[in-house]
Amino acid sequence: MGLCKCPKRLVTNQFCFEHRVNVCEHCMVQSHPKCIVQSYLQWLRDSDYISNCTLCGTTLEQGDCVRLVCYHVFHWDCLNARQAALPANTAPRGHQCPACSVEIFPNANLVSPVADALKSFLSQVNWGRNGLGLALLSEEQSSSLKAIKPKVASQAAVSNMTKVHHIHSGGERERTKPNGHDAVSPHSVLLMDAFNPPSAGDYASSRRPLLPRQSPIGGTDRDDNKYQRRTPAELFSRWTRRFYAPSSRPPWRRTWFLVTAGILAFVLFVYLMAWLGRGGSDAVDEGWNNPNPQPNHYE
């Protein structure tokens, strides 16, 4: 489990394979609507992923996408065509995820931003309204709704814009909503509302910490190198810095560490000096303690 980087700071075990960060359900809807998100344990077992729709094989960047309650993402047009082809009397449990066979329709008592976003898509088609227990739409209403893109309910909280930066093999590409303008910028996720409009060229957050944050033990950029293999020198340095780092730990811990290290160093020094001194006197003692000395014969 990890902590999401959004202002809500929620604890979650869901992990974005593309950006390699922990994400909560609010971030899935607002900042990662087309990213591959599964559990962190699944990412540890296999970090490879394909950012394509499993129904049509094309990239998820093309067209509107919908995320099911199992967190699998598909093109809405592909999923709608697949489920609409089923018989009209298909039970709600018969509509299942193409990837994991989990029921598409969320439970009525489920409180989830992902479920709310999914319901907004399902309410646009008759097979979805049938599973949700809503009244069916007429042909005129269904045709008019096809021209209107479904709006995600949670996007109302973001009044100005939501920027999501995706890293591809050819470089970095910025996708801006809702106008869809593309530009090149460094990787980050910025959420800005109408109450705090950004200045020209300045997209920094207006929040300032009350107290200056200390650099974490083991490096300043922990998110980029926390999955790299550590060398023995780095592990030893990290272990020793825990005793020297100024924090709320009791002061006697540092003193105990210094005293213990000094005693061990002194014992090691005495042992080495005794071993070296005993090795030089062995040759002399062997001649005096030999009961049958052999005289040297000179020719």
Swiss-Prot record:
Transmembrane segments: 256-276
Gene Ontology CC annotations of this record: endomembrane system; Golgi apparatus; membrane
SMART domains assigned to the protein according to its UniProt record, in alphabetical order: RING (SM00184)
SUPFAM superfamilies assigned to the protein according to its UniProt record, in alphabetical order: RING/U-box (SSF57850)
Disulfide bonds: none
Keywords: Membrane, Metal-binding, Phosphoprotein, Transmembrane, Transmembrane helix, Zinc, Zinc-finger
ZnF (RING-type) ranges: 53-101
Highest taxon listed in the record's lineage: Eukaryota
Region feature Disordered, mapped onto this chain: 200-231
Subcellular location, record wording: Membrane
GO molecular-function terms, A-Z: zinc ion binding
Residues where Phosphoserine is found: 215
Membrane-related topology note: Single-pass membrane protein
Coiled coil: none
Zinc fingers classed as B box-type: ranges: 1-43
Family listed: Belongs to the ZFPL1 family.
Protein name: Zinc finger protein-like 1 homolog
Source species of the chain: Drosophila melanogaster
